[in-house]
Amino acid sequence: MFDVTLLILLGLAALGFISHNTTVAVSILVLIIVRVTPLSTFFPWIEKQGLSIGIIILTIGVMAPIASGTLPPSTLIHSFLNWKSLVAIAVGVIVSWLGGRGVTLMGSQPQLVAGLLVGTVLGVALFRGVPVGPLIAAGLVSLIVGKQ
């Protein structure tokens, strides 16, 4: 039996490797392994909880320098005194807001996920871009097409 979905996933994984987007490639390969093994019974759970777990892991990674002491409290305090740091804080707020819109959009219009993924891979491959989070990209899309 020919599995079109598996072929699409393999193609996207290949694009991920070609564009040096190992995060995308490895993520897709993990999903392929889940798909072709008895682990496929976990797909409903992955679909329901995967995004939340991913955001938790991402937040842990972002907060680790504060928790480990690599980013000392004095640096955090000084960030409120420097205009460049204030700009960085404002941009961080905007990007977080966009990410929230992206979560909403991806939940209400999951068909856009493939387009976001292909667009990211093409941007990396053709324009020497850097793979950015699909949540932020989805947030930008939501500004154009709306949340629903």
Curated annotation (Swiss-Prot):
The gene is yeaL. Disulfide bonds: none annotated. Belongs to the UPF0756 family. The chain crosses the membrane at residues 14-34, 51-71, 86-106, 121-141. It is found in: Cell membrane. It is a multi-pass membrane protein. Keywords: Cell membrane, Membrane, Transmembrane, Transmembrane helix. Pfam families: DUF441. InterPro entries: UPF0756_TM. Its main location: membrane. GO terms for cellular component: plasma membrane. This is UPF0756 membrane protein YeaL. The keyword Transmembrane helix applies.
